[in-house]
């Protein structure tokens, strides 16, 4: 049956049948969501907060233009004073009395206006408090809720969906995109309403006070709107374009950091850095274009705003003289119109940042909400489907056909028919990639078949509740997946939903899996933390814990996919017996390459290219002498051994092992008395942290200086632009007061004098010039500084990744440096640096420029008033400082909590099939939600305090006008000359007021600008924390430096490896000595083998040769050179490594093989094909539709275990290494492939030193020397036959593995 892509629909995004979700999906087509959709997850409480926050924002926005009415009234008070002098001319009082009367009248009126200004200030404080606290709480709550929903949605998705998405892309959404959504709902969203309300109120006041003057000012409004629309479009388009390369960069980072050992062993650090840099630079390219677009739009907008003011200034003299459309217009009215309209249009100039942030949030929400909305066909959260009262375990495959969603043209199963009866044990055998593991996945319903059906007890499993189905199944996979935490937690994860096994039951399962003994000997026993993915355990130890986890489930169906592949022979024998016991009374399906483990199966099915070609019991198939017979014969050893002899030897072996265990226990007891090494390791760690803390003292200046150093042209122009933009408003205010002073002396029906006309024209021309300067300044300060900031963030992100790849393996072993935590830092910390990037530095420069010029001008015109107002600044600064400190205190624990969330996220996404097979979606969802409680508690603790300090700052800033006018009138009353003629007295009042108004308006622009620092401080607090986190890693100098150019190199490398009295402890487990004085030699061109029980230290020797770690004492030599003295890349380039768990990267087959090529070496396609042929990989690669260009999926998910292993072998062989390290290199291969690959490896070993770690002794019987390791010591050594003749440990292992094979 041919399956076309159009027919394959089960993995497409499936809309929710619910009408609401259908509506949502329609609404979000187009790359970003609308405002309503952005807040779709807001509950009643959050909606109330949103409404109150919007009201507060509108209040803050309205009060500033309304304050201009009072300011205009102040001006008109002086104009009225002049009128009063004319009216009082007929009254017979002395000139001095008249002057006092005029002054007192003005003073009384202004004092009343000052009181009203104070009421406005209090209103602004209340509105500001509501705005801050509501949006702070709203954004934090929504961020936590969306993180939780997204994580839950990921847990819900089917494996087919994950096959089509890279882990890095998914994790970047929760780390980066949700932060953008949160920013879009924060106070920055409130600023949108603040600016729009300010805009509307300002123009409304203008039309009410003087409609014709406002219309003249509005002439430029269409141009302002076009500039603003261009700004918004630039932000939206380039934000969307930057998303794809950034996600791809995150994917590269997550893959490489998660597989750092493989990256180091292949010396591919620089290559991956180049790939990462390419994606980040592509992201930077779009972000820089966005910045230039925003800067250009904002510069043009400011020019048109100033031009409109120039037009208004020119027309102002007509309306005051009664020649306009409005009647009774005074200078104060002109001032009110101008200032309110100026504030309205100026508010638009501040809208770029919130619009940019909102656009980013809407684009990010589109990506995140799509995942949350998606309801898969295979929905593990569904409550639908049958839940039978019992499960008998009768399984049937009926004409099942299947293709994977990412390889639609490759048929994995072709009409599979198979019946498995209750309680039967069925074995599936065959070559790698023939479909065995696929059948296991179909039984769990990880995928649905494209044709036919799978039934359980006669019911199609698609009709069963999926949680109920998976609850009946226990699975032990080919590559054991454990989770960061304790051994106890990992075993307990196997328990059925709602069940709580006792301690005794858990220990019994561990004993059945032959895990109890090694667990008991660990310092913390079952409470031992095993590290990320169980990194602190050997492969065999992980496998045994996974088996214990499956057994504690007591399932009706047991699925064993190469369950004992990673075990040593002794453990395999014991565990196999346990599994056979566990299989009784339940249906068991075994996938195995070691055919000794399936002899007792009720039925053995031989697969070939997706079809069963033979089936029957072991002896029936042996008698058939077909494919199965050939597979068995290939695995048989030549020796035939009497079973009774084997049992006696096993007994003897166990007795000897018990004695060895007793000795080890004594050694471990002695370890507690030998604390010098442990103390040394811990002391080194403390000193490292102390150095890093010292280097963090000047981190803020380092970030700023590093940015300026690399972008000095952009930054210099931005610096000049920032100063120009900051100076524009004080000088505009100065010029505007001169204009108002002229208008105050105009009267209806009176023509302009030449001096007045020239003065008005000069003011208009100055405003035009300020507009041109402002346009250029804003382009430089916003556009170029923002572009420099984006380049800085990109550069630091690249350097940060480079430094992470720089770290030695032991650094990644630390709990705080797990993959999720490190990728979270890499994604979020550089983004947080925007708080101290060039853009923010530009904001601060503009603010300080405004403050400097404002107070400079103020001091020149009224030094007393300026100094009195300046005295308020320390109080404002104090509250700003407190606000910044509170922001830092809030940000630090939240940052740590989100990093821990990142750890859980990456861990779960990478192991999603295991999580879903265990049915532990709710467990991990709860664990993730528990991590989110820390930032949630911070909201309640810090939100009110932040809002109060911010509100007090607003109160003080808003009160400056009232304070200034009150002081100004007091100074005038004391300094003015009352003894002159009334007209001269009035002129002096107006001139003196003009100077005070100049000082006050310029100072007011300074204080308003200074208050904007409060908006910058929260971002600065986050940025400083992020910078410390980044530079902690950048400044760290690892003891094993993979980038180091130092160290010896030499020609004619022979490849002789020698261990001299090696002792070793892992830095994270300093209390446990792994190797205890090991010495051995692998001579040039020879093959040595290391055998022994899981966890005895075999794989550790491989890691020491690769120099992932340095020994605690002793020496590892290459051709007589201590490897510590060799250049690290030179050393690793001499080595080819194939590990126990093959690691491939999410790229094509050919690119994965090329990863083995040392840096600077070119290889042809023919050489790649030759390496693949040697690894027995060429045929299956060529059979795939895309051949060598086939994408292998995230971590090789589109290939079988055996296929991945063969590509990994080809990758090692293409290095043409002098030393070949094979750590269970053929463990995942079927017997046919193993034989071919083993022959290839035997050939490849000629002329090079080969060190083999193997549990299958058949693969190492031809080794030149075999070393038997037990508990970190070599207990036997010799050739295969010598050790067999010795009849010691090795002999017993061999007998235990092969017994009486005919």
UniProtKB/Swiss-Prot annotation:
Q: What is its main location?
A: membrane
| One CC-aspect GO term | membrane
Keyword match Oxidoreductase: no
- Output the PROSITE patterns linked to this UniProt entry: ABC_TM1F, ABC_TRANSPORTER_1, ABC_TRANSPORTER_2
Sites where the protein binds ATP? 430-437, 1092-1099
User: What does it do?
Assistant: Energy-dependent efflux pump responsible for decreased drug accumulation in multidrug resistance parasites.
Q: What is this protein called?
A: Multidrug resistance protein 1
- Give the source species: Entamoeba histolytica (strain ATCC 30459 / HM-1:IMSS / ABRM)
Protein encoded by which gene: MDR1
